[in-house]
């Protein structure tokens, strides 16, 4: 959830590090800092606050840029231990201000280490777990070890998760780093080398990256990078593959849109088109291989928006392939569901970033029990891709806004394709039917372009402004419409800070109906199909109790008009695939309401794009 950046090379380090940290803002943070070395002295600046406000540099950013030196490390912090203030911001230093450290993750045994170090005379200034690391290194160097030897010894004593980077004035030409269960990549540049938590941070500087694996230590110099096994210190550099990132760095820019979220909403037709075009052959081969196995069940594990995509995939897979699917919140999977996993189990893990801590933990549990694991992610080379048996990619391009949009619809596109191919190979549908389903999916980008036409978007924008002060929202749906309702409610609460809940419409009488009164907004997802008539009855039910009803419905639906205050029309699509189209108006509704409420939808409070701690 925090961000790490390091640079050593021929240019001034601080501006490069700060620009990279700005590109990591989507991860969420409450403070930032940079440390550099110049002429044998450590320079450090840090504080609580943001690096940008309204797209403009803050006072904190301007002060960080002024630090001298050709080597440095930087950090954006999301508070886990200690309040968000200057004292707790990273980098942290030792007693002599010779060593600076930045860290992502949680050090579980930090209190024990802190007490031990305090007994040896070390003084601590913060409440953080991270501060034990520079003091451990300092203690090792006091005992005669080199910076490298002391760093290795310190890392070996840490329990928990971490990505760590350190610099030292006694060896001012090297950055040392280590990783355990927290993402870290090395970037290879022409005039220096880089470290970062995420590839987007350094993409404008270099597209040549090496993902670091758990249990590895990295030695970064301006003209050399070495990667070592943390236990044996064996040099494994030659075994590492340099990946060339094809992503256009301009995708990290707003390109005329007021916010990244709106830009990414409008990029959905292309994201879906690319995913269907590039990934189809891989998915067809995967389906054929999976059907040939002796599998009895499929678990989909995910968090947040990816969980809702998993629910959409469940409906499609069960309806088309007649194969049982359970969708489990990743953080819950390890506690109960894992006991049901064996070698006859498929586990599909969905993670936009490929670094979600709870999802990775679920994958590791599944692997340990002999399951066949599959990942669906947007990031090539991410941790999850290296820990599973099969990989599916969404080809959505980098997504910067915290609230996921284009990766959600791209996830659905990939999993719908897989569901069709599973159904074909299981013999549940004919080849002709499979091709008809694929043809319909290929029309989805055009459908999304219709939904995103200015006329329709303007109607939703007006609606968002009109209802911006309604404090409680309900979203209802049936069948495939229920995960759409869940995603709509999540988007609204994420970026408008209004209370929103989603329910299966059939559950209204079992409690939620007590909360429906005059003026309460109810968003109804009313796709045509087997549940439509019952959904219409549910809409009448809430309308009779005074609710303001906003219905997302097929463009040909005439019956819904008289029961709704507003109808958002979408192109006709099969019920089984409806979430991929019906969700987009709800993204727009949340976006425009957020803007009307004066909230930055790209960076909602308390949330991070990539949740890398449990």
Swiss-Prot record:
<dbReference type="InterPro" id="IPR035466">
    <property type="entry name" value="GlmS/AgaS_SIS"/>
</dbReference>
<keyword id="KW-0963">Cytoplasm</keyword>
<feature type="active site" description="For Fru-6P isomerization activity">
    <location>
        <position position="609"/>
    </location>
</feature>
<dbReference type="InterPro" id="IPR035490">
    <property type="entry name" value="GlmS/FrlB_SIS"/>
</dbReference>
<keyword id="KW-0032">Aminotransferase</keyword>
<dbReference type="GO" id="GO:0006047">
    <property type="term" value="P:UDP-N-acetylglucosamine metabolic process"/>
</dbReference>
<keyword id="KW-0808">Transferase</keyword>
<comment type="subunit">
    <text>Homodimer.</text>
</comment>
<dbReference type="InterPro" id="IPR047084">
    <property type="entry name" value="GFAT_N"/>
</dbReference>
<dbReference type="InterPro" id="IPR001347">
    <property type="entry name" value="SIS_dom"/>
</dbReference>
<dbReference type="GO" id="GO:0004360">
    <property type="term" value="F:glutamine-fructose-6-phosphate transaminase (isomerizing) activity"/>
</dbReference>
<feature type="domain" description="SIS 1">
    <location>
        <begin position="286"/>
        <end position="428"/>
    </location>
</feature>
<dbReference type="InterPro" id="IPR005855">
    <property type="entry name" value="GFAT"/>
</dbReference>
<feature type="active site" description="Nucleophile; for GATase activity">
    <location>
        <position position="2"/>
    </location>
</feature>
<dbReference type="GO" id="GO:0005975">
    <property type="term" value="P:carbohydrate metabolic process"/>
</dbReference>
<feature type="domain" description="Glutamine amidotransferase type-2">
    <location>
        <begin position="2"/>
        <end position="223"/>
    </location>
</feature>
<dbReference type="GO" id="GO:0006487">
    <property type="term" value="P:protein N-linked glycosylation"/>
</dbReference>
<protein>
    <recommendedName>
        <fullName>Glutamine--fructose-6-phosphate aminotransferase [isomerizing]</fullName>
        <ecNumber>2.6.1.16</ecNumber>
    </recommendedName>
</protein>
<dbReference type="GO" id="GO:0097367">
    <property type="term" value="F:carbohydrate derivative binding"/>
</dbReference>
<dbReference type="InterPro" id="IPR046348">
    <property type="entry name" value="SIS_dom_sf"/>
</dbReference>
<dbReference type="GO" id="GO:0005737">
    <property type="term" value="C:cytoplasm"/>
</dbReference>
<dbReference type="Pfam" id="PF01380">
    <property type="entry name" value="SIS"/>
</dbReference>
<dbReference type="Pfam" id="PF13522">
    <property type="entry name" value="GATase_6"/>
</dbReference>
<keyword id="KW-0677">Repeat</keyword>
<dbReference type="GO" id="GO:0006002">
    <property type="term" value="P:fructose 6-phosphate metabolic process"/>
</dbReference>
<comment type="function">
    <text>Catalyzes the first step in hexosamine metabolism, converting fructose-6P into glucosamine-6P using glutamine as a nitrogen source.</text>
</comment>
<keyword id="KW-0315">Glutamine amidotransferase</keyword>
<dbReference type="InterPro" id="IPR029055">
    <property type="entry name" value="Ntn_hydrolases_N"/>
</dbReference>
<feature type="domain" description="SIS 2">
    <location>
        <begin position="463"/>
        <end position="604"/>
    </location>
</feature>
<dbReference type="InterPro" id="IPR017932">
    <property type="entry name" value="GATase_2_dom"/>
</dbReference>
